[in-house]
């Protein structure tokens, strides 16, 4: 493979090297959320800002930790986790937003993904479609414990991952509307909790790379409730999910240090 770093020791896309990051990394999509997440660290500093990838590094519980944005969707997320793993990171928590699907998943709740429907394309370049996209049990348990200790309403279950945001929200305008709408009904009947765009790629890439990956999301709103004329409050305070991710990472660090 061509060395696109030209011997710099820095990863080509993310711009980080092994000395820049911790072994524990939080992965938001939005670069602007990185500074907000880094406020939870001790002595955070900006270490890289390249394309959609912004990275801050600090400490939690005495251990070096980082936050790196991934941008939107599976392709950029898989690049991030691949390059971060090459730099020595082994534990990842994806934190972001999602849209609720089941009626009881309300705006302001947190969804913790146990697995993901592989409706996106990135994961197919890692593993056959029959291979399941599942989260790491230890990370998922830590996320659940964090949500419970913080008193945050939360749900554990499968999320649906797609590549087209508007294919979900306006399927009727798409040439393949029949497929999108029929599959959406299938995901609902199977009990999918929410829809988002990165977990499937991250779970599959993580399994290939032998690293731990979990995901938690703030539910912004629920389009199924809106369709049925039910109350459908919108919540955009991502700090709700960020707190869950940070507390979960603290638990994982403490357990690792004591094992």
What are these regions (language model features)?
Residues 1-142:
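Metabolite-binding pocket within alpha/beta catalytic cores that recognizes anionic/polar moieties
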Residues 27, 31-34, 70-77, 132, ...:
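Generic structural signal for well-ordered, non-membrane alpha-helical segments
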Residues 44-49, 151-158, 252-259:
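Flexible, glycine/charged-enriched surface loops at secondary-structure junctions
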Residues 90-91, 193, 212:
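Short acidic/polar active-site loop segments enriched in Thr and Asp
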Residues 133-191:
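Active-site rim beta-loop-alpha module in soluble metabolic enzymes
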Residues 142-150, 205, 244-255:
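Generic non-transmembrane alpha-helical segments
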Residues 200-234:
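Zn-dependent metallopeptidase/amidohydrolase metal-coordination segment
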Residues 223-259:
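His/Asp/Glu-rich mid-to-C-terminal helical/loop segments that flank catalytic regions of hydrolases
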